[in-house]
Amino acid sequence: MSSQETYEFQAEITQLMSLIINTVYSNKEIFLRELISNASDALDKIRYQSLSDPKVLESDPELFIRLTPKPEEKVLEIRDSGIGMTKAELINNLGTIAKSGTKAFMEALSAGADVSMIGQFGVGFYSLFLVADRVQVISKHNDDEQYIWESNAGGSFTVTLDEVNERIGRGTILRLFLKEDQLEYLEEKRIKEVVKRHSEFVAYPIQLLVTKEVEKEVPVEEEEKKEETEDDKKPKLEEVDEEEEDKEKSKTKKVKENVKELEELNKTKPLWTRNPSEVTQEEYNAFYKSISNDWEDPLAVKHFSVEGQLEFRAILFIPKRAPFDLFESKKKKNNIKLYVRRVFITDEAEELIPEWLSFVKGVVDSEDLPLNLSREMLQQNKIMKVIKKNIVKKLIEAFNEIAEDSEQFEKFYSAFAKNIKLGIHEDSQNRASLAKLLRYNSTKSVDEQTSLADYVTRMPEHQKNVYFITGESIKAVEKSPFLDALKAKNFEVLFLVDPIDEYAFQQLKEFEGKQLVDITKDFELEESEEEKKQREEEIKEFEPLTAALKEVLGDQVEKVVVSYKLIDAPAAIRTGQFGWSANMERIMKAQALRDSTMSSYMASKKIFEISPKSAIIKELKKRVEDNGAQDRTVKDLTSLLYETALLTSGFTLEEPASFATRINRLISLGLNIDEEESTETAAETATEAPVEEVAPETAMEEVD
């Protein structure tokens, strides 16, 4: 025998196998689903290769998956005539290179997740250790010799040139040496049960080697022949053809014997070719699990066909939960399997479905696409674009159907709200349809989310726009000073607290003819003639104060204005219409690779709004009139007011230390502590404050 080569498992794989082999998980049958799924993938690869090079199938023209139980050896064999693995692939794929999902699956498992999720993480092969404590993988690739990969789930595995087993032409045999308490998986009945439950809709024949009792005609025994000879000596009646026939028959007899033969377990025709009215929900659920590696039933299914100039059939499934790597950009999405006239082509047709719908799983079978589709043809093919357009349309229909059941829609929205918002941002054609699916908490719906359509029905007659506020969380926005004036007018405000919300609304711009207005930016609020008149008077009255505040704050603000949109709060900071909001500025600052030039360009000039109704503002106005803008107390109070407004308006402070110094001075004042008693450090920090030079007297001594 050829010399063995021993390799160490990658550390994460060793941990994974240890977790699996020692699990107390009861539903261990899923190992067969995972291994059949891997076999099906290997067959997909060789069939796809054969479309451009038919010679690759010469090593074994038949495409199949074969299950062979060997009770006497306590071994279950799973064979496929797929693409097979080279020596290097056996080493890398099964042992030394951990897949991205290895660690993620272990973390999920430690957190109490179901072992049956293993396929979603791309490490389904190792599920065999649920039932086996040793495995041999015998594999033959067209470009290499036949090799044996072997492991007992320890820290290492061996690879050997195969000189002992039968030649398999092409493909892979998994030889599982079952644990003593898992021998049920050698029973014909149990195997059939598991295949029917999990793998009935695999596209290739799954054959099971079964033992059947058959009747067979065999020659009669010698004694019987002798008796026959004696009978021949007796006088006979005239023979006829029938008697001759009987005579022939009498020379054989029927006996029962056991024979082994292959039985196909998945004869059901492809589900998508059947009429939707003939397919049961159980069949849809089973089919979904077979193509998705999910252990749960789908939330919804859309089964349809398109006929006319273009023909295709599709079954699309919406899962109950988002996969762990939904927004992992480097991972290839392989959720939609593309067939052409029942022949599998690829599960990497990214052109078939937009990225924002990448959570949808299913099958598309086209009658019109060519069988020899290349990557370039997929990207440029007009038929693909039409199929994609139809798929998106049907899925939006499905989402609206889910929305009719509030409980189901809540599950859907909690899992895939980000996808809907991404769709609004990216898909201009379907933006208006998707907007109907959006749900938000609001000033009138704090505990339950509301739709934009319901918002519009609640709008007072004189309200012209749909108002929203952006922020980090509901708690951060529900006490915002920006809400006061709108609440006073009975105008509802939507709370947008998901970072993607603002991107979506920037593209959406309007809903049912009503403008979407961000109240953290400068905007025109509906007002009566009386309110307009009062505002004009207040602007005139507070003009000296706004000029003084602008003088103190300088370039920190674009302008200081008297606000008619504030009630309780003394001041707030709004941004211009076309720059970033405070929330967007926060999001962009968190981007590690942000463009600093773009940041300085888009960071909008700030508008400092003061409320003429506020007692603080009225007192500050009086101080300015008495002492002028350069008064120490006026300057200090202005800076404190501005920095506080920055915080309540959702901004971050550029110089928190200066702000802290001013607050500490206020605390000292409240506690009747003289400035001389303050620490030297505090005094030094105060000198660094940007708004003034340090005066010899207590900065806030005049404040009551």
From Swiss-Prot:
What segments bear the compositional bias annotation Low complexity?
Answer: 680-689
Compositional bias (Acidic residues): 690-704
Keyword Chaperone in the entry? The reply is yes
A single GO molecular-function term is: ATP hydrolysis activity
Q: Give the GO biological process terms.
A: cellular response to heat; protein folding; protein stabilization
Q: Which InterPro entries match?
A: HATPase_C_sf, Heat_shock_protein_90_CS, HSP90_C, Hsp90_fam, Hsp90_N, Ribosomal_Su5_D2-typ_SF
Task: Report motif location: TPR repeat-binding.
Answer: 700-704
Basic and acidic residues composition bias: which ranges? 226-238
The residues that hold ATP are 38, 80, 99, 125, 375
Q: Which family does it belong to?
A: Belongs to the heat shock protein 90 family.
Annotated domain remarks: The TPR repeat-binding motif mediates interaction with TPR repeat-containing proteins.
Describe its function: Molecular chaperone that promotes the maturation, structural maintenance and proper regulation of specific target proteins involved for instance in cell cycle control and signal transduction. Undergoes a functional cycle that is linked to its ATPase activity. This cycle probably induces conformational changes in the client proteins, thereby causing their activation. Interacts dynamically with various co-chaperones that modulate its substrate recognition, ATPase cycle and chaperone function.
| Assembly | Homodimer.
Protein name, UniProt field: Heat shock protein HSP82
- Name the gene: HSP82
